[in-house]
A protein has these predicted regions:
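Short, contiguous alpha-helical
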Residues: 10, 14-28, 35-91, 135-179
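Residues within well-ordered alpha-helical secondary structure of globular protein domains
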Residues: 30, 53-56, 113, 124
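Acidic/histidine-rich alpha-helical segments that form the ligand environment
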Residues: 86-133, 149-157
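Basic/polar N-terminal segments that are highly enriched at the extreme N-terminus
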Residues: 1-11
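Charged, low-complexity, helix/coiled-coil-prone segments
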Residues: 1-3, 43-61, 94-111
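Glycine-rich, flexible loop/turn motifs
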Residues: 32-34, 73, 126, 130
Length: 179
């Protein structure tokens, strides 16, 4: 088909994901602190927490698991304290410190930095590269995952939480992601 990338490329995935990234960052860009604090229920995460969680999870999976990118990308999402009882600080991210809500600018930048990392990987990797295995030791044992699983997991995670953000915005009469 004309205009289609070669079969050995991940650019089809990268293109669709880039579109979702753009929809998300445009939806967040001009939100006020009050709008970023909107949530569906008191016990649910606010818009800023969902977006921060998305960005931090990207850094966690691509850096900590796959060894991609500079440590500064991962460190961007670390916090000095958490408001979540019994959550170890090394496992905490932006979303876990409700005393420090993130701004639209911080969220858009965090999503941009992590998207740049993901996009560079997708442009470099081939489908065969997705079969590589990665193992991490944690306090509860070892876990092994395939690179392709990580790509899929982070993509589905983005779509899921992006949908939550879109729904929250729409429920409050704000423009949702224009999917």
């Amino acid at each position: 088909m004309p205009g289609m990338p070669p079969v050995d490329s991940l650019s089809i995935i990268a293109g669709g994901w880039a579109n979702h990234q753009g929809l998300l960052t445009r939806a967040l860009h001009d939100l006020t602190p009050e709008q970023l604090g909107l949530r569906t229920a008191p016990q649910q995460w606010a818009v800023w927490q969902l977006a921060g969680h998305m960005a931090g999870s990207r850094a966690y999976w691509f850096h900590d698991w796959l060894g991609e990118g500079d440590a500064s990308v991962r460190d961007l999402f670390r916090v000095e304290q958490t408001t979540v009882p019994d959550l170890p600080l090394e496992d905490a991210g932006w979303e876990d410190d409700e005393d420090r809500p993130r701004t639209a600018s911080e969220l858009v930048e965090g999503l941009a930095v992590t998207w740049d990392l993901i996009h560079a990987c997708l442009m470099r990797w081939t489908p065969d590269d997705l079969t590589a295995n990665f193992t991490r030791r944690r306090s509860n044992g070892e876990r092994t995952v395939e690179r392709g699983w990580v790509v899929w997991h982070v993509l589905e995670h983005d779509i899921h939480h992006g949908g939550e953000i879109s729904q929250i915005l729409g429920c409050y009469g704000l423009p949702p992601l224009d999917v």
